[in-house]
């Protein structure tokens, strides 16, 4: 029998695959899907445009590209960790305690979201939220089991994904990496490279 490779993907790649399959199968209305999933570079360019468009700031005083990278990272964290933010650049009922930096961020974020909404774009963090809603709606075809591996901690967005998968009947598990104790090393000699390759293949097959 031919060995089947492990279907291991990053979270974003897997979500993109199952949502893309649902779109092609017609289980997701194309009109409800984003026209474009922004790449990291495209997202940063859009943030830079939002910063430039802010009449309250003199963008010539900033490292625009560096600021766009920092603002994109901050917005991503706010999305995936479900951080509460004041709306519309106000103080959120905090009596004016919001810093000028946060007010600027909120203005840029509002401009960024308006630009995305007008053009039908989504940056990675909100794209994941859209894909999660597609899973919850039953639009995506799911495997019987999904294993999470390599996460040192889970964001609220990832916990929501786990709950959505479990609600759809998927077995969700966490795959531990590494070993509880060090393995034992064994030294072996072989007459030539071909024999060594055959032995390595047999060793790997015995552990699959």
Please place each PLM-identified region on the residue numbering.
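Basic/charged alpha-beta structural segments of nucleotide/phosphate-handling enzymes
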Residues: 1-142, 156, 178
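Carbohydrate-active enzymes and regulators
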Residues: 10, 47, 149, 200, ...
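Generic, well-ordered alpha-helical scaffold segments in large soluble proteins
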Residues: 111, 115, 134, 161-168, ...
């Amino acid at each position: 029998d031919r060995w089947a490779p492990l279907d291991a993907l990053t979270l974003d790649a897997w979500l993109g695959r199952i949502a893309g399959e649902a779109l092609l199968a017609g289980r997701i209305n194309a009109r409800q899907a984003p026209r474009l999933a922004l790449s990291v570079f495209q997202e940063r360019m859009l943030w830079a445009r939002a910063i430039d468009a802010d009449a309250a700031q003199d963008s010539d005083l900033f490292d625009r590209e560096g600021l766009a990278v920092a603002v994109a990272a901050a917005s991503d964290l706010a999305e995936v960790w479900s951080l509460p933010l004041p709306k519309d650049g106000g103080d959120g009922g905090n009596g004016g305690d919001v810093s000028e930096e946060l007010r600027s961020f909120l203005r840029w974020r509002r401009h960024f979201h308006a630009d995305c909404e007008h053009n039908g774009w989504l940056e990675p963090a909100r794209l994941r939220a859209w894909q999660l809603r597609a899973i919850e709606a039953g639009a995506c075809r799911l495997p019987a089991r999904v294993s999470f591996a390599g996460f040192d901690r889970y964001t609220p967005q990832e916990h929501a994904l786990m709950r959505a998968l479990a609600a759809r009947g998927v077995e969700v598990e966490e795959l531990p990496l590494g070993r509880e104790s060090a393995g034992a090393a064994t030294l072996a000699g072989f007459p030539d490279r071909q024999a060594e390759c055959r032995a390595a293949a047999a060793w790997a097959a015995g552990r699959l």
